[in-house]
């Protein structure tokens, strides 16, 4: 099984892996749990697009992940931060492989403009990077 080195985009980091889609979702869930995140929501984009628009789309899921302690810390500092929570992790199929990506919390929280959130955002990113790296 070969895996690509993690990639970084403008707003997240990802890794393409040679693991079946369903297995990648389970591995991502397990890795998130290891880092103290719970999955609060799971949105099956393929299913929703078929249901709402009647269109076919690749298999694609959004996992809404939350680390309660870090979320609480952030909410204490910025009550409206809930608009940017939870941290999304996506899993989708591409060219016969599976891509797993996580949001860059530092970039996302930078829109708030509160320097007190920088250390928490860095901590979240470290955890999410470990999730992606472990796959």
Question: Where in this protein do the model-derived segments appear?
Answer:
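Terminal, regulation- and interaction-focused segments at domain boundaries
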Residues: 2-36
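Solvent-exposed residues in well-ordered beta-strands and their adjoining turns
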Residues: 18-20, 66, 92, 103
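Short Gly/charged-rich anion-binding patches and loops
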Residues: 26-27, 44, 77, 123, ...
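Compact, glycine-rich, soluble single-domain proteins
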Residues: 34, 38-90
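Short secondary-structure transition/capping segments
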Residues: 83-95, 132-135
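Beta-strand/loop substructures that line and gate deep hydrophobic ligand-binding cavities in soluble
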Residues: 88-114
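Well-ordered alpha/beta subsegment
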Residues: 111-135
């Amino acid at each position: 099984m070969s895996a690509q080195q993690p990639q970084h985009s403008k707003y997240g980091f990802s890794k393409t892996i040679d693991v079946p889609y369903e297995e990648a979702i389970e591995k991502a869930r397990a890795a998130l749990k290891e880092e103290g995140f719970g999955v609060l929501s799971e949105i099956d984009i393929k299913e929703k697009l078929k249901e709402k628009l009647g269109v076919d789309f690749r298999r694609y899921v959004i996992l809404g992940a939350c680390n309660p302690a870090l979320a609480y810390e952030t909410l204490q500092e910025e009550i409206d931060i809930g608009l940017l929570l939870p941290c999304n992790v996506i899993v989708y199929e591409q060219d016969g492989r599976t891509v797993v990506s996580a949001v860059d919390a530092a970039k996302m929280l930078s829109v708030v403009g509160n320097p007190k959130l920088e250390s928490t955002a860095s901590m979240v990113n470290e955890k999410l990077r470990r999730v992606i790296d472990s796959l």
